[in-house]
């Protein structure tokens, strides 16, 4: 929606999106995805329905939908602090999430990760590798990579990145070697976000006790070897993860 894009200070409009997708199809790309943000100040549930409908009408193969995060130091954060814009409403964002989930499912795009839906055979390879803790490379300014338990990231500024490459230097800014405990916590954090769920083998008895309470309240399902989020459980996935990894 144009007024939503204006609040987010975006320079494109819906017509640009349609044009870009048409060009991508013409260029031969077999999988095309659209990224959406919901919960923008001033965005109604009807606005969001129209946005998702417009995206699905383009016959795309994949949708990513993310709740708006107001980052400190941004223009949007300053506008909210001054009272010019309202703080995103959590209940409305929950309704928006459930709406995009249902609309995607109705059009044959099934969720495979909390924020991602795809037609059969069109799940994002990078997203899946990241969520499953496999090796992956990130190219470009600020990009992160993960190889054999080591995480590293590049300098953020494009000019600095370019200068290092032209000088024959590595653009890597810093790195860290994940401990066994960190790797396990990340496997829990990321695994529970996936449709196939979290392996019970990764959990300790006290963690299963916490999850049993969530099962009692209808937020998770626990079968022989996996923990699965229910639709309402997906709305509080971050809270569940915090409670089982502290």
Each predicted region: which residue ranges?
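Generic N-terminal initiation segments characterized by hydrophobic and/or small/turn-forming residues
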Residues: 53-55, 208, 232
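Minor-groove-contacting beta-hairpin "wing" of winged helix-turn-helix DNA-binding domains
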Residues: 226-230
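Short, amphipathic alpha-helical interaction segments positioned at domain boundaries
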Residues: 232-246
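Short amphipathic alpha-helical interaction segments
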Residues: 202-217
């Amino acid at each position: 929606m144009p007024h939503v894009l204006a609040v987010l200070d975006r320079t494109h409009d819906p017509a640009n999106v349609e044009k870009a997708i048409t060009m991508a199809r013409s260029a031969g790309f077999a999988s095309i995805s659209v990224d959406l943000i919901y919960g923008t100040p001033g965005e109604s549930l009807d606005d969001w329905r129209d946005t998702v409908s417009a995206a699905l009408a383009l016959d795309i193969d994949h949708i990513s939908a993310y709740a708006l995060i107001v980052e400190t130091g941004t223009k949007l954060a300053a506008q909210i602090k001054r009272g010019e814009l309202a703080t995103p409403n959590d209940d409305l964002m929950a309704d928006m999430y459930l709406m995009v989930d249902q609309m995607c499912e109705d059009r044959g795009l099934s969720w495979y990760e909390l924020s991602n839906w795809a037609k059969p055979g069109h799940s994002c390879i990078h997203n899946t590798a990241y969520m499953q803790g496999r090796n992956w490379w990130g190219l470009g300014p600020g990009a992160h990579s993960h190889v054999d338990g080591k995480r590293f990231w590049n300098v953020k500024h494009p000019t600095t990145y370019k200068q290092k490459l032209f000088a024959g230097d590595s653009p890597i800014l810093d790195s860290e070697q994940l401990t066994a405990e960190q790797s396990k916590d990340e496997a829990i954090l990321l695994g529970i976000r996936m449709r196939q769920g979290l392996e019970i083998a990764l959990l300790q008895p006290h963690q299963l006790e916490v999850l049993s309470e969530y099962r009692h309240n209808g937020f998770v399902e626990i079968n022989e070897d996996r923990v699965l989020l229910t639709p309402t459980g997906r709305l509080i996935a971050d809270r569940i993860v915090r409670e089982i990894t502290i």
